[in-house]
Amino acid sequence: LWMLRVLCRLDYRVEGREHLPARSSIVLLKHSSAWETLAQIRIFPRQTWVLKRELMWVPILGWVLWLLKPIAIDRRGGGVAVQQVLEQGRARLAEGFWVMVFPEGTRMPVGQTRRYGMSGVLLAQAEALPVVPVTHNAGFFWPRRGWLKKPGTIRVVIGPPIATSGVEPRAVNERAQQWIENTLETLRPK
C-alpha cells in the first residue's frame, strides 16, 4: 500500500472502525478491485479468507495465501462449499481469526452486483455472531482487471454489525447487500 501511495498517489482512509466488534467476526466485503485484497490485511485484525481454491495453485501467491490459513473452496461445489465454510470457518473463529467473505463470489465491475452467497451469513448464525458489512470505492481507482491506477483517496466504510440471530438468512443477506451497494453509491469520486 505504501508503494501505491508513493508511485500511484493512491491513498486510503477507513471510516467506521468503531463498528468493529471486540471479538472475531464475519466480514462481508465488497469485491471490485485487487486493492481490497491487499488492504484488508492492514485494516482488519488477524484474518482468514474464503477464496477459490484455484488461487492456492498459483506459484508464490498460493504459498503466501497458505500462510493465512484460508478456507479454499470449489465455487462450483454448491452445498459442499457452504459446508466447508461452516466447518472451517467455525475452526478459524475458535482460533481467533476473523473470517473475510466476498459475498458476490468474484470481483464485480463498479456499478454491478449479483446475488450474495449465503455462506457468510450461515456461518454467522451458526456461531451466534453478527455480520459486519464493508464497502469501498477502490474499483473507481483500480478497476477490475485493470493495471492502470488513478490517483486519489480510496474510502473504506465499515458498517454497523447486522444481527443474524432469529432472522431469516436471506433477509440478513439482503440487508447487508442493500447497505453495501447503497453506501458504495455515496462514495463515487467527484
Sequence positions of predicted segments:
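N-terminal membrane-anchoring alpha-helices
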Residues: 1-13
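A generic structural signal for well-ordered alpha-helical segments
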Residues: 4-5, 65, 92, 124
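Catalytic core of membrane glycerolipid acyltransferases/transacylases, capturing the structured
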Residues: 5-7, 22-78
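Secondary-structure boundary/capping positions in well-ordered alpha/beta enzyme cores
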Residues: 10-11, 46-47, 71, 96, ...
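Generic preference for hydrophobic
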Residues: 14, 27, 49-50, 156-158
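Thr-Gly-centered strand-to-loop micro-motif
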Residues: 15, 51-52, 73-75, 103, ...
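Glycine-rich helix-loop-beta junction characteristic of Rossmann-like nucleotide cofactor-binding loops
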Residues: 16-20
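Non-catalytic C-terminal accessory region of glycerolipid acyltransferases
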Residues: 82-190
